[in-house]
Amino acid sequence: MIKQLILKDFIIQWKFLIWYILYPIFFYMALTDTENLFIIMSVIITIGAIVKTFEADSKNESEVIVNSLPILRKQIVYAKYIVAIIILFISVIVGCFTMGMKNGVNLFEFIETTMVASISFILIYLSLVLPISFWLAYKKAIFITLFMLIAPTAICTMFFEINLEQIQLYNSLLFVSSICMFIVSAFVSMKLYEKREF
């Protein structure tokens, strides 16, 4: 049954496939900084796709329909987390392909530094956003999701100088911590979703 739930979310994504192709092309032409290009692409594709699955569930009332079927709520949560991981890997592959097209980019060094840091930050963000999305209805969750994406970025840009090189020194710790946080987040989402009423 989890496979069918995953398939459902990916069928929804086909409608937006053209945008996922156009975004990297647009940023490839607009940005010269390869680190920023990769980070922006991976964040937009991953977060955008996940938000769209929740939006489609809310719009089509598919959550209500799915919950009326003999499916455990934890299976619904697991399916959404698996979809998030698959989309993250797809966005990383697209990002690496785009980076490979850039002249003068050391792809192996790029993977060890920027890519690992980017994946870690996306996993941390998903660890916060997914439980909120399972806990609240889509309309409430989307505002919190956007705030959580925009506010920290704006605050760090305005008041702090973000140094990717310093962040990259702690890549291994950050990556392991983000994976642990993502796993804990899945259990939290499960508990919140089981208590939610439809």
Placement of each model-derived feature along the sequence:
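Alpha-helix N-cap/helix-start motif at helix boundaries, enriched for small hydrophobics
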Residues: Q75-V77
